[in-house]
């Protein structure tokens, strides 16, 4: 995995350049983005860029299950500024009402579109990516994931109380992510330092889902100085 360390401004600029290059090579690219743990500045930079996404297809990487996945605090709401500024040829999102049996239909849609060309992920402080929480299996495709209590506590303010906070999410799995041609992983802040170290220097293991990215041949990891402090 290639690691890029610098100021947040510099690494976002480099990431944006990589996205621009991918779209220049293949304007009709299929791109999966997880807004979970992805610094909002990344989406802002893409929205403000001169990249043309009008021939590309966006696949939202994860969403809360049930009504939480349809309201103002749905994960998909984070994409509104990007899709307003940069219309895509098509935008797809996991069905928040899908059950376990039908969750993998999302993978079928991805494959029907020709597979993923690019995946952009945020690094969670426990090494999770999208809603692939610690313990996520290497072979999982899109699936219903139980959200860890610490995850629910982190988002509880959006939903009023912990009791009202979603308990499950639907997410593309590690298998789906590793099927992409290129992966960009972003981690900012000291809270990501331990996870970044485990992801880059540890062995691939289920308790650090991001560590499975070591098995891919084209991954770039973007860190600020605080996130890279334990490397």
Predicted regions and their residues:
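Ligand-binding beta-strand-loop-alpha-helix segment within the catalytic cores
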Residues: 53-120
């Amino acid at each position: 995995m290639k690691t890029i360390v610098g100021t947040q401004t510099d690494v976002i600029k480099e990431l944006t350049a990589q996205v621009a290059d991918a779209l220049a090579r293949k304007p009709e690219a299929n791109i999966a983005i997880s807004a979970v743990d992805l610094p909002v500045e990344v989406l802002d930079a893409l929205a403000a860029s001169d990249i043309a996404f009008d021939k590309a297809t966006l696949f939202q990487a994860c969403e809360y299950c049930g009504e939480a996945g349809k309201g103002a605090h749905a994960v998909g709401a984070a994409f509104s500024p990007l899709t307003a500024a940069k219309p895509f040829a098509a935008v797809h999102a996991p069905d928040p009402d899908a059950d376990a049996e039908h969750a993998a239909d999302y993978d079928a849609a991805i494959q029907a579109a020709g597979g993923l060309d690019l995946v952009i992920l945020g690094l969670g402080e426990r090494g999770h990516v999208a809603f692939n929480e610690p313990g996520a299996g290497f072979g999982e495709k899109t699936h219903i994931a139980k959200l860890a209590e610490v995850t629910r506590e982190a988002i509880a303010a959006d939903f009023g109380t912990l009791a009202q906070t979603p308990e499950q999410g639907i997410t593309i799995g590690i298998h789906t992510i590793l099927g992409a041609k290129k992966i960009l992983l972003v981690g900012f802040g000291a809270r990501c330092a331990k996870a970044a170290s485990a992801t880059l220097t540890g062995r691939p293991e289920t308790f650090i889902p991001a560590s499975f990215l070591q098995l891919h041949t084209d991954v770039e990891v973007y860190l600020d100085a605080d996130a890279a402090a334990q490397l």
